[in-house]
C-alpha cells in the first residue's frame, strides 16, 4: 500500500520529502532501485539504480535540485531533499523502492503532497480620491505571495466586513510564478471613513491588514495577525 503524507515549504527554502522504512532497516545499495517522480505527469525527479551513477534521465527542472543521501539509503531512508522550492513544485511526488533480490518486489511506496507558500508584501493602500462628488475610491496592492490570496475590505470603526460587491480584485501571476493582487474599493462618500485592506494567505493562516482614513495620506501602522476575520464574518461576506 502507498503511504500518503503532506508537507509545506516556503518559496526559496529547502524541504525534505519523507520516504523511509522503519528504524533499524538495512539495505544494500547494489540491491535497491529507488525512483522519485511526480505523481500526475510522471516527471523524473531523481533515482538510484545500482552500478548506474548517471542521472541523465532526471528532468531539467530537478537536476541538481533533488538529492537522496547514500548514507541514508543504507539505513532505509530514501527521503528526497529538494532545494530552492518554487511555486511549480506544488504537486504530489511519488517515492518507489524495489528490491532486486526479492524479484523486484515493492519494498516501499510513499506519495508526498508538497504545499508551497510565500508571504505577501504588506499591503499598500492609496490615499482615497474622488472620481465624483458622492464616491470615494481606495486601491490596495500586495505582491509576491502564494497561493492565491483572499482580499477583504474592513470598516475599521466596528471591524465589520464591507460588501465584496463594492470591490474589484485583479489577481495575476508575475514572472516569478507568484501572485500580485490589486483591489479597488468604491464606496459612497461620508464625512469620515476609516477602512482597512486585508490580504489573507489561507495556507499560512496569516492576514496582513493596513488601514486608511479620509484626510490621511499615511495608512495606519501595518500589522500582521492570525485570522483576525472570524469564520462567521467571512461567511457573511460571501
Task: State what each model feature region is.
Residues 1-3, 118-128:
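Proline-enriched interdomain boundary motifs that mark the N-terminal boundary
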Residues 1-13, 235-238:
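N-terminal Sec-dependent signal peptide, specifically the hydrophobic helical h-region
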Residues 9-17, 28-31, 73-77, 83-95, ...:
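Solvent-exposed loop/turn motifs of extracellular immunoglobulin-like beta-sandwich domains
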Residues 17, 22-64, 146-167, 196:
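N-terminal V-set
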Residues 27-29, 102-109, 207-212:
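Beta-sandwich strand segments
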Residues 38, 112-118, 212-219:
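Interdomain boundary/hinge segments at the C-termini of tandem beta-sandwich modules
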Residues 60-61, 100, 192, 198-206, ...:
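Type I single-pass or GPI-anchored cell-surface glycoprotein architecture
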Residues 63-113:
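Ligand-binding face of N-terminal immunoglobulin V-set domains in extracellular IgSF glycoproteins
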Amino acid at each position: 500500500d502507498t503511504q500518503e503524507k503532506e508537507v509545506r515549504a516556503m518559496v526559496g527554502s529547502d524541504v525534505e520529502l519523507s520516504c523511509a522504512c522503519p528504524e533499524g532497516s538495512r539495505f544494500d545499495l547494489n540491491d535497491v532501485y529507488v525512483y522519485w517522480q511526480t505523481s500526475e505527469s510522471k516527471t523524473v525527479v531523481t533515482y538510484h539504480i545500482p552500478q548506474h551513477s548517471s542521472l541523465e534521465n532526471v528532468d531539467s527542472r530537478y537536476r541538481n535540485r533533488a538529492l537522496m543521501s547514500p548514507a541514508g539509503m543504507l539505513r532505509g531512508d530514501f527521503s528526497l531533499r529538494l532545494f530552492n522550492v518554487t511555486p511549480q513544485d506544488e504537486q504530489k511526488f511519488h517515492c518507489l523502492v524495489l528490491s532486486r533480490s526479492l524479484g523486484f518486489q515493492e519494498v516501499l511506496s510513499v506519495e508526498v503532497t508538497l504545499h508551497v507558500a510565500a508571504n505577501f508584501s504588506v499591503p499598500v493602500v492609496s490615499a482615497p480620491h474622488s472620481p465624483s462628488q458622492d464616491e470615494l475610491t481606495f486601491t490596495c496592492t500586495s505582491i509576491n505571495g502564494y497561493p492565491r490570496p483572499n482580499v477583504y475590505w474592513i470598516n475599521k470603526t466596528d471591524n465589520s466586513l464591507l460588501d465584496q460587491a463594492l470591490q474589484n480584485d485583479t489577481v495575476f501571476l508575475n514572472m516569478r510564478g507568484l501572485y500580485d493582487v490589486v483591489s479597488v474599493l468604491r464606496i459612497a462618500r461620508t464625512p469620515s471613513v476609516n477602512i482597512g485592506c486585508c490580504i489573507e494567505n489561507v495556507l499560512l493562516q496569516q492576514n496582513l491588514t493596513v488601514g486608511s482614513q479620509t484626510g490621511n495620506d499615511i495608512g495606519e501602522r501595518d500589522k500582521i495577525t492570525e485570522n483576525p476575520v472570524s469564520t462567521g464574518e467571512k461567511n457573511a461576506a460571501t
